[in-house]
Amino acid sequence: MLRFEDWELAVVIILTRFMEAIAIIISIYLAFNGYKLRYVLATAGVFLLSVLINLTGLIFRPYFIYFSLASIFLSALILTALILYVKKNPEKTKSFSLPENARCPVCNVLILKEDELCTAKIGNYTYYFDTCHHLVQLLKEPDYFVERGNIFKGELKEVFVKTKDTKKWKKFSEVKLVGEDGRLVAYENPPKGAKVINPEEILRESPLS
């Protein structure tokens, strides 16, 4: 069996505790930024897994350092995979539950239907819209709604929409906008022959961007 110096053992223990702290911090971050519960629990589970592995190492004391190294490796691997997945797929990992008594900041109407629900994070506040058309209105003229007191001024951080055809949440920049009955509707796969508007142009021209 390999022999380890005391300082090497100390480094391994410090790294183990560091990974556990990172797991807790990420779990708290996800919880307070509206991510789904299963991803919050998954990151918290990394901490519990690390503790369990290290407790097992204490039972088999001669192999403690090997258990600690395994804990570091597994924690780093799982956390990295979770972070990459959450960052790449926010539309799948975030929770878009409509708050009680939420009103659209454009029409100020209580949102009852979620068929075309949209959400935008501006500054530190998240706003919900009853239609994609109202979302686009705000993106084009945010100052008007700031002056009316409907929203607080801030930087546009996240915009998500529920598509009409698939009912899936998508990033606003990834959908296709189609004009229907005088208003804009978000599609993942627009109808054939429909005139499509690129939402990225709206984002580029928005004073919030």
Swiss-Prot record:
Keywords: Cell membrane, Membrane, Transmembrane, Transmembrane helix. It is a multi-pass membrane protein. It comes from the Bacteria. One of its GO terms (cellular component) is plasma membrane. Its main location: membrane. It is found in: Cell membrane. The chain crosses the membrane at residues 10-32, 37-59, 64-86. This is Uncharacterized protein aq_1428. It comes from Aquifex aeolicus (strain VF5).
